[in-house]
Amino acid sequence: MEINGVEIEDTYAEAFPIKIARVLITAATKRWAQVAATEATGFATSVIMCPAEAGIEKFASPSETPDGRPGVYVQICTFKYEALEEQLLERIGQCVLTAPTTAVFNGLPDAEKQFNIGFKLKFFGDGMESEAQVAGRKVYKVPIMEGDFVTEENIGAIAGIAGGNFFIFGDSQMSALTAAEAAVDAIEELEGTIAPFPGGIVASGSKSGANKYKFLKATANEKFCPSIKDKVENTEVPADVNAIYEIVINGLDEASIKAAMKAGIEAAVTVPGIKKISAGNYGGKLGKYQFKLHELF
């Protein structure tokens, strides 16, 4: 299969189950909502060594938020609900409560699983906190130096999916990077997914385990490393490819990840110098979900 003259390999992305909480952060301005969201989703690229995977899902206009202010939806992902609750408390408590003019609302109010994060955060008020209603939602008002920090009582979570992905093969580092940026821009327009790596892009895609250093959980995916393509048996790097970037996508459900992969690939192949699109899979060792590239189209 080809799209815009670029080969789409007949392969699949292998993904795995993960627990996902969705949080809406609002602020007086879009800038401060984004600052708080960026801080709250830091050090969260991969569960290989981070305590969570997290990222900005989408921006929300004032007409879409409970308090009528600009907002940002973020997703925070861990393997277990217990760890997810800890991450929510720490990230909201340290990165959102501390940020100017912010408020926190439940991004999954209909989810069966609910964490009473707001109830726990209210204790920062040391007895001076109060209950209120915002657009029919129960919130706590915590007095702080600038005024009141408003947080909804609960934050919802569901069983989602992590590790949807595709690889972008370019004839140069800049062509591949430009295509990866275009892919991330397209994905950011959609609802239900995040791309948790820096700027949404993975420069150092890994394989599960190691050939030599068995103490590592993940190591360089040497079959996709252009600088050593002449040294690696069964390299996956074509002769005319000199850089590869991976886009990793987490999402609330399979449909959201498929839509994000499709949009990202369609954007990437419009960039001159892109030679091929592939995906990462590990023979079923990583997860139970398979997103076949050809079936996206």
Curated annotation (Swiss-Prot):
Kindly list the places in or outside the cell where this protein is found, as annotated in its UniProt entry: Cytoplasm
Any idea which UniProt keywords this protein has? Answer: Acyltransferase, Cytoplasm, Methanogenesis, One-carbon metabolism, Transferase
**According to its UniProt record, which reaction does this protein catalyse?**
N-formylmethanofuran + 5,6,7,8-tetrahydromethanopterin + H(+) = N(5)-formyl-5,6,7,8-tetrahydromethanopterin + methanofuran
**Keyword Acyltransferase carried by entry:** yes
Q: Which GO terms describe its molecular function?
A: formylmethanofuran-tetrahydromethanopterin N-formyltransferase activity
Recorded GO CC terms: cytoplasm
Gene Ontology biological process: methanogenesis, from carbon dioxide; one-carbon metabolic process
This enzyme's EC code(s): 2.3.1.101
Q: What does this protein do?
A: Catalyzes the reversible transfer of a formyl group from formylmethanofuran (formyl-MFR) to tetrahydromethanopterin (H(4)MPT) to produce 5-formyl tetrahydromethanopterin (5-formyl-H(4)MPT) and methanofuran (MFR).
What protein name applies here? Answer: Formylmethanofuran--tetrahydromethanopterin formyltransferase
Q: Which organism is it from?
A: Methanosarcina acetivorans (strain ATCC 35395 / DSM 2834 / JCM 12185 / C2A)
Gene expressing this chain:
ftr
